[in-house]
């Protein structure tokens, strides 16, 4: 199972709850999409989203493909993927 993770944003103006980003996850097999508005595009938000919306509902993905945003390559994110034996891949820059 492969998932793609991406942040959409920064959105101007922010929502009434001050959300400026949307974190999206796409299951590449079923094309199922999960999304969550966030205030920040940081690694702790990604990990909380994965634990609460992906791992607990769909099982552990074998691979996560992301863009080259700093939050996806942080030490916390790499450690998280290593702990769950998830291969972390970054798409090419275009």
List the predicted regions and their residue ranges.
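Retroviral integrase
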Residues: 1-94
């Amino acid at each position: 199972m492969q998932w793609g993770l991406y942040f959409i944003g920064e959105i101007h103006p922010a929502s009434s709850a001050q959300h400026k980003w949307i974190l999206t996850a796409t299951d590449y097999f079923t094309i199922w999409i999960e999304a969550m508005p966030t205030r920040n595009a940081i690694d702790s938000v990604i990990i909380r989203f994965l634990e609460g919306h992906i791992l607990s509902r769909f099982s552990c993905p074998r691979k996560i493909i992301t863009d080259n945003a700093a939050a996806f390559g942080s030490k916390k994110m790499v450690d998280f993927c290593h702990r769950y034996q998830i291969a972390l891949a970054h798409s090419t820059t275009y």
